[in-house]
Design a protein with these regions (language model features):
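Conserved N-proximal alpha/beta basic substrate-recognition cap immediately N-terminal to
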Residues: 1-53
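A short, local hydrophobic-aromatic micro-motif
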Residues: 24, 52-53, 132, 144, ...
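Phosphate-binding site of ATP-dependent enzymes
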Residues: 92-173, 178
Length: 191
């Protein structure tokens, strides 16, 4: 399993495929698709997997008002293809929004802006098409950003998450569907 740039985005897998080197895990195309938040949102919509309303903006479009995209504050701003929540912000004010856009565009030429949905965060692992117990991820403060992902003691993870049987089955079903739709045929994690 590879983490981070070149590993999660399919570049290492593509290189191995070209060189005929066997590896475990998902192939290059599915890895690349899964890292692109704009494309995954399109796949999710096409297959009835819930995803927040949002828009993908290219550099130069950041000055257009949120209302022109059917969005209003608060919103989540994130680089299109990044990982580990690098460059991800929850913007509650116009000032926070403009700063978030500036920072997100410093990572990539495309940014995803989504409606902010307040709630709990969960992670569902899928191996060979079967979902595993759900993990609830609760940051001690703020949201599950880069700092909270990698600083010891900054999050509380509960497994299995305290959820009704109905919600558990629903979330696991969506994670299995995501793995199927994106071709993540070995193992994956859906948040």
């Amino acid at each position: 399993a590879l983490h981070g740039a070149n590993g999660e985005d399919g570049k290492v897998q593509a290189t191995f495929d070209l060189l005929g080197i066997p590896y475990t895990g998902t192939g290059y195309l599915s890895s690349a698709l899964a890292m692109d938040k704009s494309i995954t949102k399109q796949f999710f919509r096409a297959h009835n997997v819930p995803t927040p309303n949002g828009v993908t903006l290219k550099k130069g479009q950041e000055s257009e008002p949120l209302s022109s995209f059917g969005l209003e504050l608060p919103v989540v701003v994130k680089p299109c293809c990044g990982g580990s929540s690098v460059g991800v912000y929850i913007a509650h004010t116009n000032e926070e929004y403009w700063q978030a856009m500036k920072d997100a565009f410093s990572y990539e030429p495309e940014v995803v802006v989504e409606e902010y949905i307040e709630g709990r965060e969960f992670s569902v692992g899928v191996v060979d098409g079967k979902a595993y117990p759900i993990i609830e991820i609760a940051p001690v403060e703020g949201f599950y950003d880069y700092k909270n992902k990698y600083k010891a003691g900054s999050t509380v993870e509960t497994c299995p998450a305290e959820l009704s049987e109905q919600i558990t089955k629903e979330l696991q079903g969506y994670a299995e569907k995501v793995a199927e739709v994106l071709g993540l045929n070995t193992y994956s994690r859906t948040d």
